[in-house]
């Protein structure tokens, strides 16, 4: 089903990444009804790309964006998150902030994190996951902060900017 992010956890997420939202391009992956991306838009994000494969959740999301007048700054993609990440490296590189809130499916979470890790460039990635989940080893994404709320853990990863290879 559709899992709205609980209010307390959502509040905590925005307390952790507040300053990074302004003018950022945001990816809301496994978006569901889009609670995290919509909140980011309301806090000054330049734009949000919502990606999910569930038709029902996306219908609700589109309706919410319409009612709130946020369609102009939104792009809704219906599709498999991991495949989309692998097929859209430019859009991933442009993102300054990524919300990753998959159904508690460890395999999908790890695949999405690894796909993000391959293209991560000057980005903050916020992952909501079960406290039982062991994070995979990642090359670029480094754990910045972690908060626990019952059985849910919010992990914030950061990846530094990729150094340009041009020499003066």
Question: Whereabouts are the PLM-identified features?
Answer:
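Class I S-adenosyl-L-methionine-dependent methyltransferase catalytic core
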Residues: 1-168
């Amino acid at each position: 089903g559709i899992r709205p992010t609980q209010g307390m956890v959502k509040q905590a997420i925005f307390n952790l990444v507040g300053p990074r939202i302004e003018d950022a391009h945001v990816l809301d992956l496994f978006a569901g009804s889009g609670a995290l991306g919509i909140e980011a838009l309301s806090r000054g994000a330049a734009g949000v790309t919502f990606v999910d494969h569930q038709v029902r959740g996306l219908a609700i999301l589109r309706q919410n964006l319409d009612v709130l007048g946020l369609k102009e700054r939104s792009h809704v993609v219906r599709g498999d998150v991991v495949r989309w990440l692998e097929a859209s490296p430019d859009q991933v590189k442009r993102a300054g902030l990524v919300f990753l809130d998959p159904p508690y499916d460890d395999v999908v979470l790890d695949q999405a994190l690894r796909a993000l890790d391959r293209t991560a460039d000057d980005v903050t990635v916020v992952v909501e996951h079960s406290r039982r989940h062991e994070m995979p080893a990642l090359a670029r994404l480094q754990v910045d902060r972690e908060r626990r709320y019952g059985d849910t853990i919010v992990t914030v990863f950061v990846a530094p900017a990729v150094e340009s290879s041009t020499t003066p």
